[in-house]
């Protein structure tokens, strides 16, 4: 059983980035649920746990401790960017092993397709808590810029959030070689 830990960024009293009438915490939760549902409905041999399934406050250490204790095989942290840019980028901890880079490559490649027409900002490294304190391969994604109108308009469309979530799931499925269910839901 492959164990996937999905971490929708922010939540509760931490809205994350805010812009164009959107809150990061709401978008990350929607994307995470689409990712979870796609994995569970379409693949066998996979188990999913989420750091939160509603709008509640969860500390960074609670997220990583939960994933470590559960024995997750992969940790995927979903975020929305801010700061006036545009497009998609992904992060891993600096100098990680090839396995984590392969997971990043698989997810990045699928999500970039969901963001067609947007800038691919590249595969990056960062010393983020959720990448540093996890004991399994961990990838953090930044899915568009909430404070850029073009990106925000894209993120306001529920079908696009679904596409992004499903792309995350496809990347994970590809990396782990998950078996498709005979009758996907």
What are these regions (language model features)?
Residues 4-16:
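Short, surface-exposed beta-strand segments enriched in small/polar/acidic residues
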Residues 16-30:
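Glycine- and acidic-residue-enriched helix-capping/strand-helix junction motifs
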